[in-house]
């Protein structure tokens, strides 16, 4: 039976909700932990609902069923399909399935992705409707994840109290207030032998800017050394920074005027001769934020030894995503100051004590004493204490994101930027070291609150099983309905980027999930990892990806439930459309390659829908699309001429119906490609006059011409109607 997603979708409404979701209101599950390229829950919910609702025969009934998609109403029927997401990432698909009451199996090779998905779906279901076990809980009845959230808040505050007692000496207050941040500049020895002073490498000396009222740290030479004096007013342009140009590590020495070269700074960094100097301190006072010059007390407090148990982990030598290794910062621990390392390792080291306290309280509250550990499926007191530990480990990870030497300072907001402002780790020259016990961005209290609010809103509607497995070698249950974001090998370096968090999760959670966190770093042998950025040729990477993706799709097809469409999200790039306009020079575009792999695996494309994460923009390179496909044993074949005739005859009606529920003009062509592919891929073969198989590119070119013709006629009719109305 044809499903609604294969006929029409209220696309404008769905995309508007998805774009609103991207703003991440407090309590959104994404606040549990950072992940890149998340599956928006709202659009997946709509796609799943539309895949379960039968397509109607009448236009009147179509309106009714489209309304059910907008309200995400799942039809009641016997056995519900099991949703499979073999590239689960953050767990957005599993969350969407769970909220609709659909059972799901989610898996990923990446340990961080598996842990996030377990925490978002699997763990809350284990402890649904439990009452808090801490002694300060006031209510008697709790629903959903309310009790779990309240306990995470309680034991998180206990972690903060214990950590403060251990760390207060290295985070001293001033008489006027509490330091919220210490602002630093990296340093290097001046390359001029006649000077040789320790010079700052400051991308900005400005600390605060409100119109023409600015505060800046001015480097001053005294007794052969550079120190900083704070100035107020309008900072002269030449004093805003000693960075020269926009490219490379070129800085001017404030003492002698000599310039560094990028090569010199990299050489000094590789010799472990990069340092850092405190420029200023941001204070929280009764009158607001105030800036003061560094004091001996504050500089002494920051000068702590690197902890011996700092987590190991080497940063990949991959300048596409990581700039710091080129300057000698080759390990993840090198991205943190010694005080930041001390603070983060202390949080991790205190976690077992907090878990034991939570488990002891759970036992006293009546939880089962013999339930086993969390990793073995336990649901008793031990597992509950460990679950608290998982969410507090996420709090520590989020603090690590806001507390590294990659965090720059916002001069207009008196706050710091997180490490991951984008999907890479750049080199930062002027950085801010936040105080986790203050009110600054990324402090422990506000971070804990954001995680707790996210837990409160997690669904517990159905069973979700989360596994660590490689999609290329996994075994899947029969009769599954696939819904997944297909990775593209040149998009995001998930494995490499996630190691930044993995090293801290491993330190926090290895005793709870020993197998998941056994390796020193995450596996880099995955579909989304591009060897091109590690020295391999682009053609070799592309071929490897294509072969492996084809095998994965074939494996999924073998286990697909043929009663339902299978759903694949993918990135459709401008280059994919340009290949249809200008030709592809004999090289298949990524979209063509994917369609080819799907046909090879036995799929029939039934629709392609633009499922946007952001509003349409000329600057955007790609559009997230949803490909709906069926697994069929196709027997019918036709000729190129026969396909062209079918396209002329059937395409307008199919395309018109797909557009009827509301599709933005910017999305019409992609929807048309789906309509055309539904006609092309229903055949086992389409043969050229020579007897050879018709190429997908050739079919897409024919489809594209039909789309342009249809839209031209549609727009002409619309203009004619407008003229007629004006005349009347």
Describe each PLM feature range.
Residues 90:
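Conserved SAM/SAH-binding loop
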Residues 565-570:
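Short beta-strand segments at enzyme active-site cores
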Residues 86, 107, 484:
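Conserved beta-strand/loop positions that form the S-adenosyl-L-methionine
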């Amino acid at each position: 039976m044809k499903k609604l997603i294969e006929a029409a979708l209220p696309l404008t409404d769905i995309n508007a909700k998805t774009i609103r979701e991207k703003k991440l209101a407090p309590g959104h599950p994404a606040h549990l932990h950072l992940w890149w390229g998340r599956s928006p829950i709202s659009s997946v919910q709509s796609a799943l609902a539309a895949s379960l609702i039968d397509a109607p025969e009448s236009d009147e009934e179509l309106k009714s069923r489209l309304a059910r998609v907008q309200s995400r109403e799942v039809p009641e029927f016997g056995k519900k399909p099991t949703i499979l997401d073999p590239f689960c990432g953050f767990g957005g698909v599993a969350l969407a399935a769970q909220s609709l009451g659909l059972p799901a199996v989610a898996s990923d090779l990446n340990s961080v992705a598996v842990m996030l998905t377990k925490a978002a779906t699997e763990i809350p279901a284990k402890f649904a409707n439990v009452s808090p076990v801490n002694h300060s809980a006031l209510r008697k009845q709790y629903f959903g994840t309310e009790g779990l959230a309240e306990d995470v808040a309680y034991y998180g505050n206990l972690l903060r109290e214990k950590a403060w007692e251990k760390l207060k000496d290295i985070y001293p207050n001033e008489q006027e207030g509490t330091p919220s941040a210490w602002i630093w500049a990296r340093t290097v020895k001046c390359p001029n032998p006649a000077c040789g002073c320790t010079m700052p490498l400051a991308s900005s000396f400005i600390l605060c800017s409100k119109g023409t009222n600015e505060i800046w740290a001015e480097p001053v030479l005294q007794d052969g050394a550079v120190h900083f004096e704070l100035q107020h007013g309008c900072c002269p342009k030449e004093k805003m920074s000693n960075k020269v140009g926009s490219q490379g590590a070129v800085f001017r020495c404030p003492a002698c005027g000599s310039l560094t070269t990028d090569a010199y700074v990299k050489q000094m960094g590789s010799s472990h001769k990069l340092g850092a100097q405190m420029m200023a301190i941001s204070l929280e006072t009764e009158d607001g934020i105030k800036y003061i010059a560094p004091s001996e007390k504050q500089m002494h407090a920051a000068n702590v030894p690197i902890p011996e148990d700092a987590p190991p982990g080497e940063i990949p030598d991959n300048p596409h995503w990581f700039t710091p290794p080129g300057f000698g910062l080759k390990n993840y621990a090198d991205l943190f100051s010694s005080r930041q390392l001390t603070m983060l390792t202390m949080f991790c080291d205190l976690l077992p004590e907090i878990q034991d306290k939570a488990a002891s309280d759970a036992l006293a509250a009546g939880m089962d004493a013999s339930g086993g550990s969390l990793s073995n499926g336990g649901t008793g007191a031990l597992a509950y204490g460990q679950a608290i530990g998982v969410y507090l480990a996420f709090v520590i990870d989020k603090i690590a994101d806001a507390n590294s030497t990659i965090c720059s300072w916002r001069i207009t907001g008196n706050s710091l930027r997180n490490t991951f402002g984008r999907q890479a780790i750049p080199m930062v020259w002027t950085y801010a070291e936040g105080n986790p016990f203050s009110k600054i961005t990324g402090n422990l209290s506000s971070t804990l609150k954001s995680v707790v609010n996210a837990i409160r809103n997690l669904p517990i509607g159905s069973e979700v099983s989360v596994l660590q497995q490689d999609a290329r070698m996994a075994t899947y249950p029969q009769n599954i309905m696939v819904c997944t974001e297909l990775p593209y090998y040149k998009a995001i370096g998930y494995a490499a980027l996630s190691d930044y968090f993995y090293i801290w999760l491993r330190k926090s959670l290895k005793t709870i999930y020993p197998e998941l966190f056994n390796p020193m770093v995450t596996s880099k042998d995955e579909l989304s990892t591009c060897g091109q950025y590690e020295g391999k040729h682009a053609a070799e990477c592309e071929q490897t990806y294509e072969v492996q993706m084809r095998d994965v799709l074939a494996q999924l097809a073998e286990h697909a439930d043929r009663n339902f469409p299978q759903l694949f999200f993918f990135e459709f790039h401008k280059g994919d459309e340009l290949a249809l306009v200008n030709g592809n020079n004999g090289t298949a575009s990524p979209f063509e390659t994917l369609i080819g792999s799907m046909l090879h695996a036995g799929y029939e494309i039934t629709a392609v829908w633009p499922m946007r994460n952001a509003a349409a923009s000329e600057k955007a390179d790609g559009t997230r699309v949803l490909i709906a496909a069926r697994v069929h044993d196709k027997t019918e074949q036709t000729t190129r001429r026969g396909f062209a005739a079918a396209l002329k005859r059937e395409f307008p009606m199919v395309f018109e119906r797909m557009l009827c529920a509301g599709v933005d003009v910017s999305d019409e062509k992609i929807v048309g490609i789906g309509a055309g592919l539904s006609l092309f891929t229903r055949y086992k073969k389409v043969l050229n006059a020579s007897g050879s198989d018709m190429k997908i590119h050739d079919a897409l070119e024919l489809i594209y011409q039909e789309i342009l013709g249809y839209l031209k006629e549609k727009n002409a009719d619309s203009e004619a109607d407008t003229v007629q109305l004006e005349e009347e």
